[in-house]
Amino acid sequence: MSWMKINPRSMKRALSTVANSLAVFAGLLILWQLVLLIFRVPAYMLPSPWAVARSVVSRAPTLATAFTITGEEALGGLMASVVAGAAIALVFAQSRWIRRMLYPYTLLLQTVPIVAIAPLILMWVGAGTASVTLIAFIISLAPIIANTTQGLVSVEENMVHLFLMHNATPAQILFKLRLPHAIPSLFVGIRVASGIAVIGAITGELYAGSSRVGEGGLGYSILYASSQLQTDFLFALVFAATLLGFAFFFSVMFLEWWFLHRWHESARTPDAG
Amino acid sequence: MTTEFVAPAVELTGVTARYGNGANVLEEVDLTIGKGEFVSIIGPSGCGKSTLLKLISGLTLPSKGMIRVDGMTPKNARETISYIFQDATLLPWRTVHRNVALALELEGASTERRKQKTAALLELVGLREVAGAYPRELSGGMKMRASIARALATNPRLLLMDEPFAALDEMSRDRLNEEILRLRTEQKWTAVFVTHSVAEAVFLSSRIIVLAPNPGRIYQDLSVDLPQPRTADLRSAPEFDAFVSRVSHTLRASRSL
């Protein structure tokens, strides 16, 4: 397959990018260690990089479990908002009137602070992954609705005219024109939503983290580690959370590229242009 | 001898079209286009050239007057009309082949017929080699060829073209002008062609309608009595130049009305 072909020049560039990032990372570690040495910070305030690394290794199973739980919650929430968001966008695309009437509510969805409604959800759904997934879903829904609707309604007038001239049915205009046209915008929405879904899942866990004591996702474990002053583990969890965010972002980027690179300008690989 | 009544390809009677603000884009337009004619519509901007095409296609409705295409209302006649837009309006997510097949697909043609017809048309417009390419990989001229192929796929009797070559460089434009005439020798469609270019209008048409602006109306109806069939050589003939300058003159006069 053509996408698997590796261009030596871009390979070299990718390697040097990785090398640069690693150099920055090494620099930060050295700085971190220096701060510890110079200011004599106690370990419960700031553990050494070495202590964090040790914590990562010794508590790897717990970390992996927390990572997986949060990942599943965020993914569940995100997938639900893709399905629901696309469906809502389809309704919105039907008429300007519907959009005017309902759009303010999606704005509401975006502006309501999740920390304010989390206790309610906890009350209604109960603690555990279901409420956390629901929180991730609610918080990541708005960008998908907004971007997909935009994509559905921004079809050029002449394209619609072309379809009309060939006696296209409304269903044909929707499925052969508006939907494919909206896919790049849908992906923009998913990209934004994926980051928010991870944040939503972690925040959700702070409130509705676990139905069982001692076992939960990253948010729950962060809360737990901080209450126990296990700062090294706390750091390990923060890294895991960052990694999760990255994993989501790059997975969406890859999917976007996979679906669009053949025809869409924005999804071209940098070395193709 | 029996005389059979043949409906003209296009007939407009007392057609007035209004903007949203109430001003007339076109006022009291009477126009009859016979079958097999190649009519160019030319005129200063704002004279309602594109509106005229939209009216004939039924995409816009007149506020007054009557429009008939082949004796039918524009909407009922749609199966016999194809429209070529200024931008090629290719679907970027479809390959050239699937773009050309689109019109047939929408009209419910069988897969077999679609394949056959599309392949033949791609051959005809010289795009066989790039059938599997996506529009973004094509030059402007190639995109327009694909757009033409798509329009011809449904065997139209009337082809409406809204400045289809305006965005192309002069060489591609000249080549496509010749192609359009060549394609017409195989399928004898009637053409209504909107353009800004006097030379293009003269080269292609059997008749040129010059519109005047504010409100848009027919200013002059010129028949182009240059020899048929037209070939590239015509462009360097003195009578071609003479006709072009005559039309340019009329066009200038229409603007200063």
Locate predicted features:
Chain B
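Conserved signature/switch motifs of ABC ATPase nucleotide-binding domains
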Residues: 133-136, 150, 154
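Conserved ABC ATPase "signature" region
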Residues: 101, 105, 112-129, 182
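Helix-to-loop junction immediately C-terminal to a conserved catalytic motif
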Residues: 57
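A short, flexible loop at the N-terminus of ABC-type nucleotide-binding domains that lies
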Residues: 4-9, 17-28, 35
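The feature captures the beta-strand-to-loop junction immediately N-terminal to the Walker
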Residues: 42-44
